[in-house]
């Protein structure tokens, strides 16, 4: 299925203090049968290198083990190291996520991800948020 979103997020310092706002442009396709994954643009406005022409992302759910999500950025013919750590937390609808940059900066849609990302350990969880109350 095709996905096209502009998701607001909060930027936190490595110490977990709110440091501003950003947006993430998500545009691509999600594969839900077999290995669940996303291929396309995941442009974090706070991280200029992720917004460059030709840079795409591959996000996998249940990546290295059940409940683990990861992200890899690439350009035609090469993987890119853009200062974004490989592991992240992201829901399958892609509207809720948390990730950490290599300098410790945290970018997240929900403050609940901050302590998880500050710990430096990635827990096997399946972050699912329902719109049903």
Each predicted region: which residue ranges?
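Short, solvent-exposed secondary-structure boundary motifs
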Residues: 14-19, 78-80
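Extracellular/lumenal and peripheral-membrane lipid-interaction modules
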Residues: 14, 33, 106
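Alpha-helical transmembrane signal-anchor/signal-peptide segments
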Residues: 1-14
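A mature extracytoplasmic/lumenal domain signature
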Residues: 11, 46-48, 129
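Extracytoplasmic/periplasmic/luminal assembly and interaction segments
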Residues: 17-69
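Non-cytosolic head/periplasmic domains of membrane-anchored proteins
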Residues: 52-133
